[in-house]
Regions:
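Active-site neighborhood of glycoside hydrolase catalytic domains
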Residues: 270-276, 280, 285-397, 402-414
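Flexible, acidic glycine-rich loops studded with aromatic residues
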Residues: 381-397, 402-540
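Acidic, contiguous N-terminal accessory segments
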Residues: 22-157, 376-385, 389, 393, ...
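Active-site beta-loop-alpha junctions enriched in small/polar residues
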Residues: 166, 195-199, 262-266, 329-333, ...
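Feature activates predominantly on carbohydrate-active enzymes
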Residues: 107-323, 370, 374, 467-472, ...
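Bacterial Sec-dependent N-terminal signal peptides
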Residues: 1-31
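Residue-level detector of anion-binding/catalytic polar loops
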Residues: 85, 188-189, 256, 381, ...
Length: 540
């Protein structure tokens, strides 16, 4: 069976994949080249390993279907990698067993303890996810496992990765491959950026023109300096059934899909579909170039507000995520300053210019707060980019700080949850950073510290996680995508998972070759010039 297909058919590789592979019929001990680095590894003085053989049984908790599926897959994977056929059961067995267990009293739901003795392997998680995550520590399995104990848990509860499909569309099949990659790195949130000036990518049944018109553009800019276009139509969108398929696929890997509908800026594709939603009435065209553009949704138009609420209602029906991302970034106010409806709404609301917040910025806060009410009414929470700070924060919003860490600092000081994703470190499509040598390129990600030192201990608790982002203005295919992501996603995973006192860049780079082998085995491409000896940057 193809290894990549096997990996995708059923998630989970076996807790003991903390260790290296061996060939069939060869007993070989594994090593501890693990990414992300566990919090604690203690090798036993007794060097007798646990040996997987035909008498080994994988035991899962009775009546737990998730664990049953995982156990079945482990058996399949062990046979694929070692040639040994093992049994699966929900009945207790004294020895020669790999036991999967859940202990909900553990402090961390995603934490786990892995105990290996010569007689058995016991993997206990704080939840099914806690069992699943160590199962994805590696892409290989050894027939002989060194005795010892691993105690592990994540540093952050939000460990995200974002993919922009608005600028360039990627099919469901490829997104599944990316979700597998996220699972391999213990990432638990897939932030799906679904709408842009250059394309609306999700079916909304009440507004069919969003995909009939908004998902298509005539051409795409391919050279910023010469303004050269490729002259080729670009299109694509996901049906609601396909989106639900992605949600299920991710959930099977304990990953939550966070949808983003970018509002009120970056909405030219929506305006091309329904021009009455803009301040000027159009005509508008789905954009073929990239940047920040003046035409945005009209915040003073009640029809526009109803449109956005209708869209969000359908989105929340598809996506069960606690978080619903509604953008808020890069929204120019020039149209609002001259729009009679926007100015009338400012007057109606009694908005006055403030030293830190213009009237139009406060109008955006009003607009976003109305959407937040809709989101909260469904028991969800609003996520927004750090520009939503500019008009004053909405009551329960979570901030994604992208222009640096300062927005995150400001939000944390106001006791709002924060996810750090600064462009200078964690935008994997940043052209300036991608011109660095591979070693610098890796180091820049690995040594990012998400919790600013200037925050108090109480404020630091509001930094709930961090996220890498891939924007696709200049990323039109999987080769370019993977070159930019890998192996930096491995560095990201240690930021997200491993406590700072257990991190070390030199040791990380020593462990990295094992992960590179896994990428190759699973069919992913990656940037290869990432070690200290590689001093010349490679063209993308």
């Amino acid at each position: 069976m193809n290894k990549r297909l096997l990996f995708r058919l059923a998630p989970g590789l076996l807790a003991v994949v903390l260790f290296c592979a061996c060939r069939p019929a060869v007993i070989e001990k594994g090593n501890l080249d693990v990414i992300p680095q566990p919090q604690e590894i203690v090798l036993a003085q007794d060097t007798t390993p646990f040996v997987i053989n035909h008498s080994t049984t994988i035991i899962y908790p009775a009546a737990n279907e998730k664990m049953h599926r995982t156990a079945d897959f482990l058996a399949t994977f062990i046979k694929e990698m070692t040639g040994t056929e093992v049994r699966v059961s929900d009945k207790e067995k004294g020895s020669n067993a790999i036991i999967l267990a859940v202990d909900t009293t553990m402090t961390h739901p995603e934490g786990y303890k892995l105990e290996i003795t010569p007689e058995k392997v016991l993997l206990t998680g704080g939840s099914e996810a806690g069992v699943f995550l160590p199962i994805l520590k590696d892409g290989k399995v050894a027939a002989a496992l060194p005795a010892g104990t691993v105690t592990d848990f994540p540093r952050f509860r939000y460990r995200g990765f974002m993919i922009d499909v608005g600028r360039h569309f990627f099919p469901v099949s490829y997104l599944k491959q990316m979700i597998d990659l996220m699972a391999l790195h213990n990432i638990n949130y897939f932030h799906w950026h679904l709408t842009e000036d250059q394309g609306w990518r999700i079916e909304i049944k009440k507004y069919p023109k969003l995909t009939e018109i908004g998902s298509r553009r005539d051409s795409t800019i391919i050279d910023w300096e010469t303004k050269k276009f490729d002259g080729k139509p670009h299109s694509g969108f996901y049906t609601q059934d396909e989106a639900r398929e992605i949600v299920r696929y991710a959930a099977d890997r304990f990953i939550t899909v966070v949808p983003e509908i970018d509002l009120p800026g970056h909405t030219t594709a929506a305006l091309a579909s329904y021009p009455e939603l803009g301040c000027t009435g159009g005509p508008y065209k789905v954009l073929c170039s990239f940047g920040v553009f003046p035409d945005v949704l009209c915040a003073g138009n009640e029809q526009t507000l109803q449109f956005t609420k209708d869209v969000l209602d359908e989105i929340m029906d598809i996506f069960p995520s606690e978080y619903i991302h509604i953008g808020g970034d890069e929204c120019p106010k020039s149209r609002w300053e001259k729009c009679p409806k926007c100015q009338a709404k400012i007057k109606e609301l009694g908005i006055k210019a403030l030293p830190k917040h213009s009237k139009e910025n406060q109008l955006q806060t009003y607009f976003m707060s109305e959407l937040e009410k809709e989101i909260n009414a469904h028991g969800r929470r609003m996520l927004g980019w750090d520009e939503v700070l500019e008009g004053g924060l909405t009551p329960n919003s979570t901030i994604m700080s992208w222009r640096g860490i300062q927005g995150g600092i400001e939000a944390a000081r106001q006791h709002h949850d924060v996810i750090m994703t600064p462009i200078q470190r964690l935008y994997f499509s940043n052209p300036r950073i991608n011109k660095m040598t591979g070693f610098e390129w890796m180091n820049r990600v690995y040594n990012f510290e998400p919790i600013p030192a200037e925050l108090t201990d109480a404020e630091k608790k509001f930094v709930i996680g961090t996220q890498g982002c891939i924007w696709t203005e200049w990323t039109a295919d999987s080769t370019k995508m993977e070159w930019q992501i890998l192996p930096r996603m491995a560095a990201l995973s240690e930021i997200q998972w491993t406590l700072p006192e257990h991190k070390n860049f030199d040791r990380f780079m020593e462990r990295l070759p094992e992960m590179l082998k896994i990428y190759s085995d699973l069919g992913y491409g990656y940037r290869k010039d990432v070690f200290a000896a590689d001093t010349v940057a490679v063209k993308q």
